[in-house]
Structure formats: C-alpha cells, structure tokens
Curated annotation (Swiss-Prot):
GO terms for biological process: heme biosynthetic process. InterPro entries: Ferrochelatase, Ferrochelatase_AS, Ferrochelatase_C, Ferrochelatase_N. Keywords: Cytoplasm, Heme biosynthesis, Iron, Lyase, Metal-binding, Porphyrin biosynthesis. Its EC number is 4.98.1.1. Its main location: cytoplasm. Belongs to the ferrochelatase family. One of its GO terms (molecular function) is ferrochelatase activity. Pathway: Porphyrin-containing compound metabolism; protoheme biosynthesis; protoheme from protoporphyrin-IX: step 1/1. SUPFAM superfamilies: Chelatase (SSF53800). PROSITE patterns: FERROCHELATASE. The lineage of its organism: Bacteria, Pseudomonadati, Thermodesulfobacteriota, Desulfuromonadia, Geobacterales. It catalyses: heme b + 2 H(+) = protoporphyrin IX + Fe(2+). This is Ferrochelatase.
Amino acid sequence: MSSKTALLLLQMGGPDSLDAVHPFLMNLFTDRDIIKIGPAFLQPFIARRIVNKRAPKVEEYYRQIGGKSPIRELTEAQGEGLQQLLGEDFRSFVAMRYSRPSTIDALAAIKRAGIERVIALSLYPHYSKATTGSSLNELKRVLKESGAKFEISYIDRFYNHPLYIKALSEKVVQGLASFPDRKDVEIVFSAHSLPQSFIEEGDPYLDHIQETVRLVMEQVGEGSHTLCFQSKASRVKWLEPSTEATIEQMAKAGKKNLLMVPLSFVSDHIETLYEIDIQYGEEAKALGIERFVRSESLNSSPLFLECLADLVKTAAK
C-alpha cells in the first residue's frame, strides 16, 4: 500500500462536449439534494421531460463558450498546483458530481493507486446541502456500496478563510483597476442562487455568502456594492434579488460602470463564461451600462492554491 494521501477534489462538473449536455442535465435534475420534483419515483420521468426541452438551448450556450465546459481541466490544474505546494506525499484526484470523472471513477483510481488515506476537499467555499452536501452524500453512498475502506477526512467549507478572502479581494482590486475612477464603480457580487426554502430550513449558505462579501469589502475598502443571485433552475421561489433584476436596477439608477464579481464559483464555467460575460453583458449594454467588467475567477490563483493547501495541511494533522 502507498503511504501517500489522496486529495479528492469535489466539484460540480460540466459537459465535456455538446453530446454530454443532455446526460449532464439529467444527472443534475435527478439529484434530489438540489431539486425535488414530485415524488422520488417520478422524478426521473419528470426530469427527462424538462431536460429534453432545455437541452437544445443549453447546448447553444456551451457552443458559444467553445463547445464544452472547461471545469475539468481547471480543476485538474488546481489539483496539480496543490500537489506542487504539498509535496510528494499527496496525489490529487477529481470527482465531479454530475459528469466525468465521477465519484465512482475517482475512488476506483485511488484504490488502484493503493492509497488508503483520503482528504475530500469540496471546492464550494460556502456550505449548502445542495452543493457540498450533495457531493458528500454521493461520496458516502459510493463508499458504502463499494465496501471500500479508506481513512477519510472532509473539508466542507472555507468561506471565511483568510487566504480565500485575500485571493478574492485581489481579483476585485484588479477588476477595479480597469476603471478610470473606482469611485464610480458599482461592485456586484453574483452568487449562485438556491431555493428560498433551503434557507428557511436552516441551510447556512446565505449566511456564508454574506460573510464572504463583508470580509472582502473590509479588504477592498470603501465602495458601493450589492449582492445578487444567478442561475435559478426551477419555478419555486429562489434567493433574490436576481442578477438580471439587479443590473436593470443599476441602469435605472444611472449607474454606468459595473464590476461583476462571481461568488461561490472558484473556476470558470458556464455561469461565468456565458451567463455573466455574454448574457448579462449584452443585457447591461442594452440598458445603457457603459463599462461592464467581470473580475477574474480564482482558478489557479497562487493565493487561492495556498488557501487550499492550508486547509489540507490542517486536515492532515
């Protein structure tokens, strides 16, 4: 057996081709940790109807950003960067919740490598049962069904880690530098939305998001800012205000310069590359916003990788 520790990076995933869009959406819409559609036994049938209707439109979104999601390559790069920081005692693996490599794939690879110790690191900074909770539930289910025996530790949040806040603040400051006068800029933090019912049932996601914004603005300094939510995925009430409504409100208030800050996303994918850059960018231009800029995603930011490495070192003690 190997003395190495497996670093298992848990991420949402994304289609690696246009043909993979349909199965990706099916995996998403049949996950009852994030979306409950009718009784459990009916959800696969209802999900298929929804996905059959949505898939052509979503395929077009992916076509506009290169025909696939870059999230696998970006997550693997984060893993490689972590290995360099942590040294030869660690080896990284990736488990995508709704695409390949799946949790089953990742655990099989760890087993083949003869590694017995695993640190599962969720790449969602803000805990929610719909994201980290779902990934951990899937991991525990696969472990139980496979009978695999690992010594396993979990890292399920880092929304207030000083290095995460520093890395995010760095990106905001860099984004502000692209404007002639930062005093004229509205900083718009855009987080992935969740059904309002999750928060009412005690999910800490919104509290975590708000704390991240507070801590980032402490480092960035003075500046007008707001928090909104994107990527609503069903008809039930989700967190508000929506990003679309916020951009419209900013335009009506006479704001001309917006800095979009993707929050709850640590890698570029459809929510940043299409929704913010293309969809919201076009909407903002049509509404009279003169300068619409998105701060860079963290991806393999050195500060962000240092944050993840610190989390792993703490979990490994």
